[in-house]
C-alpha cells in the first residue's frame, strides 16, 4: 500500500494524471486516503471522520468543491497550503513582517480644495481622465449596515434616489464628455469586482437599470472566488460547520482584483487601447469624484507609478497610514501600514512615543482611503511578472498559549493597496492628501457602531454622515464658486449630531469638477439658497440669478441647454424627519431620516427637447404665490383660466435648429416625475 501511494503520488506530481488534491479520493484504493491523511496533514479532510462528526470524508460534492478550490488559486491547493504554512509558522513564532524597516513620512502632495494649485492639478486630471480605466472593488453586502442587499444599491443621496452604482456610472459618463485630443475613441471602461455574495445582485442591478447609461461593452463584471479555510497552525483544511462534507471557505481579500485583471486579459486590453492610468476605488464613498481628478493630475505631473488618495488621520486611529519604509541596505518602499502595525513599529524604531500627532493635530502619516491611481505601464509590467499575485498575510485568533489551535478558522488574505511591494524598486510611489470634507465619507458602519464612534470623537462613517457630508461638501463648493447659502443647523439622526446644510445635489452631468461648478455659475451670478432648501441640478444648466427658499429641481436632457436668467422660488419644500423605529424602509433605518415631500411643495423644471432654453421673468397671476414661484413681482398680473390656475407658469425662450421664438407654457409640459426625466 505504501509503495502504491508513492507511485501514485509520483505520477500525480509529475503531471501525468494530476487533477489536484480532490482527485486523490478517486485514484487511491479504499483506505489509502486515511494513510495519506495520517502523514500529510493538509489532506486531513480525506481521513474518516471522528465518531462525533456528522459528516464523512468529503462526499462527491465536497470533492468537486476541492477541485474548484484547486483551480481557482494560482498554483492550486498545494501552493495555497504551502504559503499558509510559511505564514502560520511566522505568526506562531511572533515574527514581525516589518522587522528591520524604519518608517518615515513619505513624499506626497497636500492640496486645498479650490485654490490655484488644486485647480491646476484638477485641470490636468480632466485631460488625463479619458485615458483611464476604472476598477470598482465591490464585494460587500449591506447586512452589517442593516441593509438587505449589496452596498452599491444604497442611495448615495435620498433626495434623488441615485444609488452609489448609478452615481459612479454617471461620473464615468461625464468624464468621457471631456474632449481630449488623442484620447481612446471608445468609452471609458468600468470593471466591477464582485463576490459570491454580490455577483448576481450586481448584474441584476445593472441589467434592470440598462447599465445606467453606460454601454454593456464598457462594463466588465469579474467575480472573485473564495479560498479554503484553515483549522490550525499546520494548515489543515477546515470543514464547513454548516455542512461537514464541505470545506469551509471565506473571501481572500480585495487584493484578488489584480489577479483577475491579469487572468481576464482586461489590463492588457486597456493598455493596447491607449489607457495610461488604472483607477481603483471602493463602493460607498459619495465624495470620490470631488478629489479623484486632482489626484490623477498629480500622478501625471509628478510621474507617480502609484498615487494613493489620502486624508488627514488622527494618531492611533483605526485606519491604515501611508509610510515610507527604509530597509537596512538603504532601499525603501512607500506603502500602506495597518494601524495596529504602525504604532509598535514607530516605537521600536524612530519614535519612542509611537504614532502621535504633530503641530497640525493629526498624525504625520496620511490616512489611506483605498482609492488608488496606478500608471498603466508600470502596472502591466508588474502583472506580467507576478501574474497579479501580491503579498498575502494571515491573521489567526489563537485558542490558547500554545498557538496551535484557533478560536475559529482562518485563511490567507491579500489587500489591493499592497501592490507597491510588487512594483519595480525604481517606481515612484506617493500620495495626494485632501481635507476629509471634500474627499472621504464612506458608509461603513451600522447605526449602533456609528454611535459608538461618534461618542469617542471619531467620524461615524455611516449612512447618516455619508449623505449629510455630501450636502455639506456641495454647499461649501458652491460657496467657493460664489453662491450665498445660509449656514447649517444642528440636527440629530440615529443618535449622531450633524451640521445639516441645505440639501444641494448635482449630477456629474451638471459638473464633475470644481472648474465645472464655476462654469455653471455665470459671471457675477446671484445665487441665494436658504438652509431649509433642496436644490437638484441635472444636466447642462447655467445659473445667472436664483433665489431659493424651498425645493427646486431642474433637469436638462442631453442636448438641452438651460439658462436660469432670473428665478425666485419659495414653497413649503421638503423636510428631513427623524426615522421612526417602526419604519420598514431599511435605507431610512441606516440613514436615520426620511424625506417628507408634501403635495405641491416642489417646483420642478424638466427640459426634454434639445436646444437652448432660457427661463426669464413672466407675467404674474393671482394664484401664482401659492405655488411658490415668482419671477418679477413688479410685472402686472393677468387672469388665468380655472385649468391654468393649478399650474405655475414661466416663460421659456427656445432656440432650436428647426425654429426659434418665444413660447409661454405651463410647467406641466416641462416637468416629469423625478427621477424619470433623466432616464
Positions of the model-derived regions?
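Domain-scale recognition of functional cores that engage charged ligands
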Residues: 108-133, 144-417
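N-terminal regions that are enriched for targeting/export leaders
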Residues: 139-141
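N-terminal chloroplast transit peptides
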Residues: 6-18, 22-25, 32, 37, 42-44, ...
Amino acid at each position: 500500500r505504501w509503495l502504491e501511494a508513492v507511485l501514485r503520488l509520483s505520477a500525480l506530481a509529475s503531471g501525468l494524471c494530476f487533477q489536484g488534491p480532490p482527485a486523490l479520493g478517486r485514484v487511491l484504493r479504499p483506505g489509502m486516503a486515511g494513510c495519506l491523511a495520517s502523514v500529510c496533514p493538509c489532506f486531513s479532510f480525506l481521513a474518516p471522520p471522528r465518531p462525533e462528526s456528522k459528516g464523512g470524508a468529503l462526499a462527491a460534492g465536497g470533492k468537486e468543491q476541492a477541485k474548484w478550490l484547486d483551480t481557482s488559486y494560482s498554483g492550486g491547493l498545494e501552493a495555497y497550503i504551502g504559503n499558509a504554512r510559511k505564514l502560520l509558522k511566522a505568526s506562531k513564532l511572533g515574527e514581525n513582517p516589518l522587522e528591520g524597516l524604519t518608517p518615515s513620512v513619505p513624499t506626497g502632495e497636500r492640496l486645498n480644495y479650490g485654490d490655484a494649485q488644486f485647480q491646476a492639478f484638477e485641470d490636468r486630471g480632466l485631460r488625463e481622465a479619458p485615458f483611464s480605466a476604472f476598477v470598482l472593488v465591490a464585494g460587500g453586502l449591506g447586512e452589517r449596515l442593516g441593509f438587505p442587499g449589496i452596498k452599491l444599491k444604497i442611495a448615495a443621496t435620498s433626495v434623488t434616489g441615485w444609488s452609489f452604482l448609478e452615481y459612479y456610472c454617471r461620473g464615468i459618463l461625464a468624464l468621457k464628455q471631456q474632449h481630449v485630443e488623442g484620447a481612446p475613441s471608445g468609452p471609458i471602461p468600468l470593471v466591477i469586482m464582485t463576490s459570491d455574495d454580490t455577483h448576481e445582485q450586481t448584474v441584476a442591478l445593472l441589467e434592470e437599470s440598462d447599465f445606467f447609461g453606460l454601454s454593456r461593452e464598457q462594463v466588465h463584471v469579474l467575480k472573485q472566488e473564495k479560498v479554503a479555510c484553515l483549522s490550525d497552525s499546520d494548515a489543515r483544511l477546515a470543514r464547513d460547520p454548516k455542512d461537514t462534507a464541505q470545506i469551509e471557505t471565506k473571501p481572500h481579500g480585495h487584493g484578488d482584483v489584480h489577479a483577475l485583471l491579469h487572468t481576464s486579459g482586461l489590463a492588457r486590453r486597456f493598455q493596447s487601447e491607449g489607457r495610461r492610468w488604472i483607477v481603483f476605488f471602493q463602493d460607498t464613498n459619495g465624495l470620490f469624484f470631488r478629489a479623484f481628478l486632482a489626484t490623477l493630475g498629480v500622478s501625471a505631473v509628478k510621474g507617480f507609478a502609484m498615487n494613493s488618495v489620502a486624508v488627514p488621520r488622527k494618531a492611533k486611529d483605526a485606519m491604515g497610514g501611508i509610510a515610507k519604509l527604509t530597509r537596512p541596505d538603504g532601499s525603501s518602499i512607500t506603502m500602506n501600514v495597518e494601524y495596529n502595525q504602525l504604532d509598535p513599529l514607530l516605537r521600536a524604531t524612530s519614535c519612542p512615543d509611537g504614532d502621535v500627532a504633530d503641530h497640525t493635530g493629526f498624525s504625520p502619516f496620511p490616512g489611506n482611503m483605498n482609492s488608488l491611481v496606478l500608471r498603466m505601464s508600470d502596472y502591466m509590467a508588474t502583472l506580467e511578472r507576478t501574474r497579479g499575485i501580491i503579498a498575502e498575510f494571515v491573521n489567526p485568533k489563537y485558542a490558547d498559549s500554545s498557538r496551535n489551535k484557533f478560536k475559529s478558522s482562518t485563511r490567507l488574505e491579500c489587500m489591493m493597496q499592497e501592490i507597491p511591494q510588487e512594483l519595480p524598486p525604481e517606481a515612484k510611489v506617493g500620495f495626494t492628501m485632501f481635507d476629509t470634507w471634500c474627499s472621504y465619507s464612506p458608509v461603513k458602519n451600522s447605526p449602533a457602531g456609528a454611535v459608538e464612534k461618534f461618542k469617542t470623537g471619531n467620524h461615524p462613517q455611516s449612512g447618516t454622515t455619508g449623505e449629510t457630508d455630501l450636502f455639506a461638501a456641495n454647499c461649501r463648493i458652491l460657496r467657493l464658486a460664489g453662491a450665498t447659502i445660509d449656514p447649517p443647523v444642528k440636527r440629530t439622526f440615529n443618535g449622531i449630531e450633524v451640521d445639516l446644510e441645505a440639501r444641494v445635489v448635482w449630477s456629474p452631468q451638471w459638473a464633475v469638477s470644481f472648474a465645472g461648478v464655476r462654469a455653471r455659475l455665470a459671471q457675477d451670478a446671484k445665487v441665494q439658497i436658504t438652509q431649509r432648501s433642496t436644490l437638484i441640478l441635472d444636466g447642462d444648466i447655467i445659473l445667472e440669478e436664483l433665489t431659493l427658499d424651498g425645493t427646486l429641481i431642474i433637469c436638462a436632457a442631453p442636448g438641452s441647454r438651460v439658462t436660469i436668467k432670473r428665478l425666485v422660488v419659495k414653497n413649503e419644500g421638503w423636510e428631513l424627519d427623524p426615522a421612526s423605529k417602526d419604519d420598514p424602509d431599511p435605507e431610512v433605518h441606516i440613514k436615520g431620516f426620511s424625506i417628507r415631500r408634501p403635495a405641491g411643495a416642489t417646483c420642478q423644471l424638466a427640459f426634454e427637447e434639445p436646444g437652448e432654453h432660457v427661463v426669464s421673468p413672466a407675467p404674474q397671476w393671482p394664484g401664482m404665490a401659492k405655488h411658490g414661484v415668482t419671477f418679477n413681482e413688479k410685472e402686472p398680473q393677468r387672469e388665468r383660466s380655472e385649468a391654468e390656475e393649478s399650474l405655475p407658469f414661466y416663460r421659456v425662450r427656445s432656440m432650436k435648429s428647426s425654429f426659434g421664438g418665444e413660447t409661454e407654457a405651463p410647467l406641466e409640459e416641462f416637468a416629469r416625475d423625478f427621477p424619470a426625466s433623466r432616464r
